[in-house]
Structures are given as structure tokens and as C-alpha cells.
């Protein structure tokens, strides 16, 4: 009996260990874990050097704006446990109808993490796609009775950068997203934004 309990106790830390996925060329790595209180967290490295420090993930729902009756809880930021994770790869080449290149390669490794918020019964997936030149993530909501229709009030996705990196960004405006791509340091975006949209 003591041996069984000790073995079970040794396995417990493994269930909350970070899940990691790397780009096809291995240069970029993204790690996901649940921080204290079951808060989804990720970080990213490039060639072993930190680029994004541990950053939290989550959403806040608009109060009383969802069809799930009886649930006053609006936070999708903590209280999660990991129910499943899987890593997969994808590689395809496709031909755009219009553009500068004849073919585009869509090649990435993916980490899908399925989370369950125990006190609400809600489920949320976070999908990370890691390419040789960057990373993307998205929130997904499997069909479920405890979250049928909802409005996202706030997105709490953090990008805790490790330095004043070079960024390529699009200046968004209230009436158009069709602006030219800008290149600057992160610290220069706010000052350059007005000139970029005018």
C-alpha cells in the first residue's frame, strides 16, 4: 500500500508539467502550463533564448449576455485543469488565386490543450501552431451545455516580451484594416500609429 501511494504521488507532478511544441526546424519552442489557481500560461523561446516570458491566457464574458442560464461566473481565466493534450504536425502546399508567389507552404507543429473549468463545468481548448517563423494561438469552445451562446467582454491574452524587439504590425483603424505593414521596435508603435493610419 505504501509503495502504491508513493508511486501515485510521484506521478502527480507530471500531470501538471509543461506541454511543449517546437517549430518544424526546432528553432522556436512554445510551452504551455497551468499556473497557480489553474491559470493557463505559455512562454516562447527562439534557439533556446526566451522571447515571450510566462504570459497568461484567458477571456472574460459579458455578464448576463449569454444564454447559459444559472451561471453568473464570467471568468475564463483560471480554475482550469487539463483534461487532454495532443501534438500533431501539418504540411501542405497550396496555390493562391492572387499574390506574389505561385505556391505557399503551410507547415507547422501544433499543440492542442483541452481544459476544463471545474466549478462551472465549462470546457475550453487552446490551440498553438508553431511555424519556422513564428507562433499563433486561438481559443476554441467545444459544443457544451454549460456554454451555449456568449459575448466576449475582454480578451486577457498576454504577450510579455523579453525586450524591445522588432515588430511588423498593421495599424488598425475604426473604418479599415487595409493599411501597409509597418516595421519598428515595440516601444515605437504607439508614437508611429497616428502617422501610419493617416
Model-based region annotation:
Residues 3-16:
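Sec-dependent N-terminal signal peptides
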Residues 20-198:
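N-terminal accessory beta-strand-rich subdomains and adjacent acidic, glycine-rich linkers
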Amino acid at each position: 500500500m505504501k509503495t502504491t501511494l508513493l508511486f501515485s504521488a510521484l506521478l502527480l507532478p507530471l500531470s501538471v508539467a509543461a506541454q511543449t511544441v517546437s517549430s518544424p526546424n526546432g528553432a522556436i519552442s512554445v510551452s504551455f502550463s497551468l499556473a497557480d489557481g489553474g491559470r493557463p500560461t505559455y512562454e516562447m523561446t527562439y534557439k533556446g533564448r526566451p522571447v515571450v516570458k510566462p504570459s497568461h491566457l484567458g477571456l472574460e464574458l459579458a455578464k448576463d449576455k449569454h444564454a447559459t442560464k444559472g451561471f453568473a461566473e464570467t471568468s475564463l481565466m483560471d480554475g482550469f485543469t487539463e483534461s487532454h493534450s495532443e501534438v500533431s504536425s501539418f504540411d501542405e502546399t497550396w496555390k493562391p488565386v492572387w499574390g506574389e508567389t505561385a505556391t505557399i507552404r503551410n507547415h507547422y507543429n501544433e499543440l492542442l490543450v483541452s481544459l476544463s473549468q471545474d466549478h462551472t463545468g465549462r470546457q475550453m481548448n487552446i490551440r498553438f501552431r508553431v511555424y519556422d517563423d513564428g507562433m499563433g494561438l486561438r481559443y476554441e469552445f467545444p459544443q457544451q451545455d454549460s456554454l451555449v451562446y456568449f459575448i466576449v467582454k475582454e480578451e486577457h491574452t498576454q504577450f510579455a516580451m523579453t525586450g524591445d524587439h522588432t515588430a511588423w504590425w498593421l495599424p488598425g483603424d475604426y473604418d479599415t484594416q487595409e493599411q501597409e505593414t509597418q516595421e519598428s521596435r515595440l516601444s515605437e508603435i504607439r508614437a508611429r500609429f497616428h502617422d501610419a493610419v493617416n
